[in-house]
């Protein structure tokens, strides 16, 4: 029992809390962006895809460094957030959530968009013929049909957010009890030979 008492659970709790909130944000943002992409022309859709999928091709540490540049207290956005909302992103738990969300978001977006593209347009036309609004068609026709793809995107997003290391370590750091997630803590233990 002494072994169990010596285990610090804060990295696990911080990781779970971060991953859950990042997944919720990516879920709604990914579905909204995927729905918007459905309505765009091919060139505009390609540009949007390139921008939203950028975190997939960037190394996570580079994504974290870019977030650090944007949200630093020496940059306009960081200054604005601090002066108006007392929100500090760098070296804080909101930084963990932001890093995990940015890195995991493309997985939700890609899965939602692929699921929406698989929906038969005849269902949408039938809903319009019945006089349903676009929102009602989306909510009662498109979402249920695309449900399995959205569910798989949600699972992938959660898993990616839970295991995020690179961007989190760059933006939020490694503060025990505050920003040390499981991935960041495991890296520290392997470097300090605490295993």
Predicted features by range, described:
Residues 2, 6-117, 141-166, 170, ...:
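Membrane-water interface segments at the C-terminal ends of transmembrane alpha-helices
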Residues 111-125, 134, 147, 182:
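Transmembrane helix boundary and interhelical loop/hinge segments in multi-pass membrane proteins
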Residues 128, 137-138:
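Canonical alpha-helical transmembrane segment with a positive-inside/aromatic-interface signature
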Residues 130-131, 144:
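Glycine/proline-centered hinge or cleavage motifs at structural transition points of membrane proteins
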Residues 132-133, 140:
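Basic (Lys/Arg-enriched) interaction patch that binds polyanionic ligands
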Residues 136, 172, 177-179:
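Feature of multi-pass inner-membrane transport and sensor proteins
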Residues 176-190:
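Short hydrophobic, aromatic-rich alpha-helical segments embedded in or entering the lipid bilayer
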Residues 193-195:
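A membrane-interface signal for the N-terminal entry of alpha-helical transmembrane segments
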């Amino acid at each position: 029992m002494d072994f169990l008492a010596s285990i610090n659970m804060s990295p696990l709790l911080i990781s779970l809390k971060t991953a859950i909130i990042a997944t919720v944000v990516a879920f709604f943002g990914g579905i909204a962006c995927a729905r918007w992409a459905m309505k765009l022309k091919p060139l505009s859709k390609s540009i949007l895809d390139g921008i939203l999928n950028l975190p997939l091709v960037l190394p996570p540490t580079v994504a974290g460094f870019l977030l650090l540049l944007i949200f630093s207290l020496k940059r306009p956005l960081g200054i604005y957030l601090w002066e108006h909302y007392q929100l500090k992103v760098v070296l804080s738990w909101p930084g963990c959530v932001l890093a995990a969300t940015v890195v995991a978001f493309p997985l939700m977006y890609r899965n939602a968009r692929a699921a929406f593209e698989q929906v038969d347009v005849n269902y949408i036309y039938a809903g319009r013929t019945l006089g349903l609004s676009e929102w009602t068609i989306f909510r009662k026709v498109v979402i249920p049909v695309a449900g399995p793809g959205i569910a798989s995107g949600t699972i992938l997003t959660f898993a990616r957010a839970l295991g995020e290391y690179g961007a989190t370590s760059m933006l939020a750091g490694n503060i025990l009890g505050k920003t040390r997630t499981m991935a960041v803590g495991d890296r520290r233990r392997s470097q300090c030979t605490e295993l």
